[in-house]
């Protein structure tokens, strides 16, 4: 039986930042990384080890200095920025560490706006879809609340609902529970894992807490997969 292609594939990926005077700082150097379809992976490592940089590359927010990145069968690197934006909106959910909710809008509206931008779900279904996913995350009674009226845990769940709204094949989350207490983190993450398991969503979470590690099938340590020295070299890169 032929094995299906991975949901996320990185090959010889490097990322450097220019320092000037012909020098660059290499922050990422990954020979190979493959995430199978439907897998749940936690990425851990110390601060500054390249975790967020890796997520941004997979999301197409940033481009590598060199190498190949494939998400859901599409090579990201050759795509112009507008095409990467459209691909991310439709195929990649991203839960940012800072939530990035729009303050003037309610929880329901924040989730619906993500669907409007991606335009992959018919408008007549968007409201009901947003209500369903917010309810699955325990926010049925918070639909009309704005971010300032929600607790940190509730804001995080709205951010997760927004990331999942378009039913993306791939979900990325950057320290989604860093500001939550242990009990709330466990509730939030288990709800997230359950939804993704139902939809065979490929999940990559940057985390170090027990709840995240307990729900993952695979744990990767950046110190083991990232070969970057973190030292300036003599070649300008970007």
Segments predicted by a language model, with ranges:
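ABC family nucleotide-binding domain
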Residues: 7-8, 13-223
